[in-house]
């Protein structure tokens, strides 16, 4: 038996890399009995059934440290959330949705702001400052003149990384620059509606020369957070945490309660209004979904 990493799954076939060799595998019936479904990113134990043709069977799945639902990927170390600084303009509420979802999975986040060549650096300074103050690393990139690509490559080394973000922001183009040995399909950006066409067909791990892995995922127009309760949401806004301890009530959801540390910090300029606006929007989504 050999231990490998599942890098792709299509139509019941699982492609597992073992010592730089890729084996086409099927899952044994015991996995179904255990109600285990192999996921891209899983570490698995396989038996090689045909070395010449690189065929095998998956015997077992090792415990997962993380599991994303959308995209469905296991054992992710970090999420790089890619947004463009223009064309399309960054949607801060959507960005915050990505951040909250990553926080609920306890996965590290790096924010990548792409298409820097289309604006002046000082034009994005405020946006960068907002999220660096919250505590998220921010990388500025441009695939057209290689700005930030070396910094991005360093962040990827030795880790399994999900690239996420809305369509049209340049995820696949960035990856094509970082991974010259792989060509990912890119879509045209519709100038009429400033929203890219979905081009990624399936989830796949791509090997890095620096002993890491990346996943290119479909762009998202929304993220579902209805699994959270109203009183839980603020726990994942990491910039709220220092001020929430000053709330009178432990159950404070930072809306209309008296003596709310978060609202006080907001009025004092210690919290950013756009982040609180995102919080209010998400609270509204959770309340709406609870009614149905």
Swiss-Prot record:
This protein's record includes keyword Cell inner membrane: no
UniProt: Zn(2+) binding residues: 247, 252, 254, 260
EC numbers: 3.6.1.-
GO cellular component: cytoplasm
Residue ranges of domain CP-type G in the record: 65-223
Database matches in SUPFAM superfamilies: Nucleic acid-binding proteins (SSF50249), P-loop containing nucleoside triphosphate hydrolases (SSF52540)
Transmembrane segments: none
Lineage: Bacteria, Bacillati, Bacillota, Clostridia, Peptostreptococcales
Cofactor: how bound: Binds 1 zinc ion per subunit.
Alphabetic keyword roster: Cytoplasm, GTP-binding, Hydrolase, Metal-binding, Nucleotide-binding, Ribosome biogenesis, RNA-binding, rRNA-binding, Zinc
Oligomeric form and interacting partners: Monomer. Associates with 30S ribosomal subunit, binds 16S rRNA.
Family: Belongs to the TRAFAC class YlqF/YawG GTPase family. RsgA subfamily.
NCBIfam families documented for this protein: ribosome small subunit-dependent GTPase A
Cofactor entry: Zn(2+)
Protein's cellular compartments: Cytoplasm
Pfam families: RsgA_GTPase (PF03193), RsgA_N (PF16745)
Molecular functions (GO terms): GTP binding; GTPase activity; metal ion binding; rRNA binding
Binding site for GTP: 114-117, 165-173
Protein name: Small ribosomal subunit biogenesis GTPase RsgA
Its biological purpose: One of several proteins that assist in the late maturation steps of the functional core of the 30S ribosomal subunit. Helps release RbfA from mature subunits. May play a role in the assembly of ribosomal proteins into the subunit. Circularly permuted GTPase that catalyzes slow GTP hydrolysis, GTPase activity is stimulated by the 30S ribosomal subunit.
């Amino acid at each position: 038996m050999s231990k490998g990493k599942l890098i792709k799954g299509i139509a019941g076939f699982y492609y597992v890399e073992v010592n730089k060799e890729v084996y086409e595998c099927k899952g044994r019936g015991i996995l179904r009995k255990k109600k285990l479904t192999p996921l891209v990113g899983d570490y698995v134990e396989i038996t090689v059934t045909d070395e010449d043709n690189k065929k095998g069977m998956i015997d077992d799945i090792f415990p997962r440290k993380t599991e994303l639902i959308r995209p469905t990927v296991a054992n992710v170390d970090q999420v790089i959330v890619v947004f463009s600084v223009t064309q399309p303009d960054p949607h801060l509420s959507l960005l915050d949705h990505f951040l909250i979802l990553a926080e609920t999975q306890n996965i590290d986040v790096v924010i990548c702001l792409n298409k820097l060549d289309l604006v002046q650096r000082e034009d994005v300074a405020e946006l960068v400052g907002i999220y660096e103050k919250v505590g998220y690393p921010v990388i500025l990139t441009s695939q057209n003149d290689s700005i930030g690509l070396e910094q991005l490559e360093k962040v990827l080394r030795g880790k399994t990384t999900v690239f996420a973000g809305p369509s049209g922001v340049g995820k696949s183009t960035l990856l094509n620059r970082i991974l010259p040995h792989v060509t990912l399909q890119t879509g045209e950006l519709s100038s009429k509606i400033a929203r890219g066409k979905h081009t990624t067909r399936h989830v796949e791990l791509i090997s890095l020369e620096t002993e890491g892995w990346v996943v290119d995922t479909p762009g998202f127009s929304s993220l579902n957070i209805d699994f959270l309760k109203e009183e839980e949401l603020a726990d994942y806004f990491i910039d709220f945490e220092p001020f929430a301890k000053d709330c009178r009530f432990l159950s404070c959801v930072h809306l209309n309660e008296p003596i709310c540390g978060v609202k006080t910090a907001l009025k004092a300029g210690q919290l950013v209004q756009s982040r609180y606006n995102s919080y209010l929007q998400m609270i509204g989504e959770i309340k709406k979904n609870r009614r149905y």
